[in-house]
Every structure is written in C-alpha cells, then in structure tokens.
Amino acid sequence: MKIIIKLSIIFSLFLISCNSETSLQKYFVEKSENKNFISFDVSPSILNVDKTKLSEEQKIALKSFDKMNVLAFKINATNQSDFSTEKLKVNSILKNEKYQQLMKFGSGKEGASISYVGEDDHINEFILYGNKKDAGFAIVRILGKDMNPNNIMTLISIMKDSKINLDQLKPLQDMILKK
C-alpha cells in the first residue's frame, strides 16, 4: 500500500512538472534552427553611447536592459501555409494571461502589438510583435530587470541619439535582402 502511495505521489509530481504550455522562449528555441526563420540576439553594446553624457533617467533605463531576442519569419512562395500555422501559434502564445497586452493596432492582414511579462514597475520582458500578410512576421523580446514603460520610452530616445552598431543587425538585413 505504501508503495502505491509513493508511486502515486511521484507520478503526480511528474505530471505537474511537465508543463506543456508553450512560452515565447520555448518557441524561439524550437524555431531558431528552422529554415523559414531567422533568429539572433542583440546586446546593449549595439547602442554606441557616451554614458557620461546620459541623464540619470537614461542610465537607469540602460541598466535595466539586458538584451533583445529577435525571431523573424520571411514569407515566400513556398512557405505560405507555414506562415499561417506559425502566426496562429504565436497569437495563441500571446493570448496566455502571462503576456499582458499594452497596445494592439492594425487589421487582420497586418498589425502589431506590444505586450509585457511582469508587474507594472518590475517588468522582465517586453514583446513587440508585428506581422504583414505578404512579408511575414517578427517578434522582438526585450529582456531586462525591473523595467517599466518609461524605461522603454527612454531606451527608444537613447536609440534615436546613438550610433547604432549595425553589425548585430546583419542577420536581419541579410534575410530582408534575400530574394
């Protein structure tokens, strides 16, 4: 009888630990080697900024930013059904309550959304998702510590004023220029 109880407990723990729920992180890992996708990371070093000239607010925003993960699907004549399938998967993942949507705009054929993971002033991840029926889609995960919406707006202003190191964006540029 004790053996049955122990086995039942172990089996229950095993089932609980096997989370079949797909996250964006799992999706990125699964698709990173798929020929229809391009995947790369962007570090804070992409922003060539003189940190001595940054305001205190800009320094805090930059410190909260760890990296960006980019995953893009470029549509072509042979992968249109894959595009539809993958777009549905991403939409399904983003509907999970873990991802809180800040903004959504566009139509059924194309659009974009901004979501986040975490609490209002302790955001761990911002997700930018955009799709266009005749081009494909891209997902950008902005990862950091204790970010907030103001940090993102400040980072965008830093990006505008920085000399961006385009070498880190070369994989995306190569994909866009491929025919």
Predicted segments with their positions:
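Sec-dependent signal peptide recognition
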Residues: 2-10
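C-terminal motif of bacterial Sec signal peptides marking the signal peptidase cleavage site
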Residues: 14-17
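Bacterial signal peptide processing site
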Residues: 19-22
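Early exported N-terminus immediately downstream of N-terminal targeting peptides
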Residues: 26-90
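Second-shell loop/turn segments in exported
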Residues: 72-80, 139-145, 158-160
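Mid-length scaffold segments of soluble, non-membrane domains
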Residues: 73-122
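A short, solvent-exposed beta-edge/loop patch
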Residues: 119-148, 155-156
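C-terminal partner/receptor-binding element of secreted or periplasmic proteins
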Residues: 148-179
